[in-house]
Amino acid sequence: MQKNWIGKSIGCEIDFVSDFKNTKIKIFTTRPDTIFGASFIAIAPDHPFTEYFKNEKNFQDFKELALKNIGTESSLSKNEKLGFKTPFFVSHPFLNKKIPIYVANFILMDYGTGAIFGCPAHDQRDLEFAKKYNLEILPVVSPNKSKSITISDHAYADDGYIINSDFLNNLTIEDAKKKIIQKIEKKR
């Protein structure tokens, strides 16, 4: 999966369990510290999970459009973010919360696992997508300890401290990454 990447991405894989036959959707993230800000799961148009609704006409139309206009990772960041809302949800691995599953035109099947968790407050593409589809935008990183921040047009992608994140609160990003990866590994 990662053999075609330029450079190396450090991160972890997280399994999200769907409400469809408890099917797992595996995501790869370089920012596990932002998991408490996840408001959606986005999968590639050709992700295996799409088999469960492949005969739905609206999905077929979306998939055709998305695959026709799909390009490289860098060109995807410039394109309009489009999504198809599936009828399914996943359970957040650390909260009693359901997260919607979307098929998105900015996710590539051959990059990572072909699925991401969207954290709109801290990723610009996720923010554009969340605004378009009225999804929650919850900041979980702040430049100052214990201080909330407001996200408007630009995601906060700088260094800082974790907020709104239960057992990760007040940790640095690096310390939070280590702690959340340990918790994820314990759940396996």
Task: Annotate each predicted stretch with a short phrase.
Residues 14-49:
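Extended, domain-scale alpha-helical bundle/helix-rich regions
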Residues 84, 102, 140-143:
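Structured DNA-binding interfaces in DNA transaction proteins
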Residues 30-32, 103-109, 152-155:
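Short, flexible, solvent-exposed loop/turn segments with mixed acidic/basic and small polar residues
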Residues 88-124:
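Catalytic-site beta-strand/loop segments enriched in glycine and acidic/polar residues
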Residues 37, 111-113, 131:
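Short glycine/proline-enriched turns and hinge-like loops at secondary-structure junctions
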Residues 1-25, 115-188:
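Residue patterns forming the tRNA-binding/recognition surfaces of aminoacyl-tRNA synthetases
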Residues 1-10, 38, 43-85:
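Amphipathic alpha-helical
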